[in-house]
């Protein structure tokens, strides 16, 4: 017969503090501090569930600061910087190949008269280095970056 296994996973507990303040006409400064408690939220795949979890996510704190500007009734732009401190955890799971990050992002928002918003954004992230050792096999993840982009269409009523 086929082998079967049970997998358990859950999302961490989060605490987030958001702020925003107008700093000039049509200009907004915003930011957040987000803490994630991973201590009881690891991924576990049987038969490892009896020995140790499959993942080794670390508690984390993420800081974001950004500025938004309304250019006209139709156009707005925003830019942000985000950082998550490294945990210095060497790692025992290939599910966690990074340790902290720094990222910059930008977006443009076009608002139609009917309330539809079209947002186009891009984000560049510099991922924290990490060495992972799992069952005698090591993986070194150094100098990795990501570029992500997206388009969102929303209707506000």
Identify what each model region corresponds to.
Residues 1-157:
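Outer-membrane beta-barrel porins/channels
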């Amino acid at each position: 017969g086929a082998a079967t296994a049970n997998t358990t996973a859950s999302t961490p507990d989060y605490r987030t503090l958001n702020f925003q303040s107008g700093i000039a006409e049509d200009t907004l400064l915003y930011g957040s501090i987000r803490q994630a408690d991973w201590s009881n939220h690891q991924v576990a795949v049987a038969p490892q569930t009896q020995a140790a979890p499959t993942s080794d996510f670390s508690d984390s704190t993420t800081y974001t600061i950004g500025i938004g500007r309304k250019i006209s009734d139709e156009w707005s732009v925003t830019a942000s910087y985000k950082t998550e401190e490294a945990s210095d955890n060497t790692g025992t799971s290939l599910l966690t190949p990074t340790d902290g990050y720094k990222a910059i992002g930008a977006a443009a928002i076009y608002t139609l008269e009917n309330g539809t918003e079209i947002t186009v954004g891009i984000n560049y992230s510099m991922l924290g280095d990490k060495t992972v050792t799992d069952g005698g096999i090591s993986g070194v993840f150094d100098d990795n970056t990501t570029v992500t982009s997206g388009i969102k269409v929303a209707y506000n009523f």
